[in-house]
Amino acid sequence: MEIKQYQIILVNLDPTIGSEIKKTRPCVVISPDEMNDHLRTVVIAPITTSSKNYPTRVEIKHDNKIGWIVLDQIRTIDKHRILKDLGKLSKPEIKEVKAILKETFVD
């Protein structure tokens, strides 16, 4: 499967430790295509359907459900954890993800 930045993928996140988000769930690919094409790992942010209004979370609508991209739990996973493709973020969602990533990790 070809993996692209801002793609939504179904990922098995188990096993986890402590407060890490667990289970098999949708995640957003954060790593750029150049990395995704050449490495056996990808950087992802999990999506949850239960969230508080944290400044590091982006609300999205996917598969007729409201969810939040959890940018405060970004992690690197092996591609073998990816189960299937679920779609892609919209352009406004991508713009908001970029803004929060920049504000959180760059500024």
Which stretches of residues belong to each language-model region?
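Conserved functional hotspots at enzyme active or ligand-binding sites that engage polyanionic ligands
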Residues: 1-107
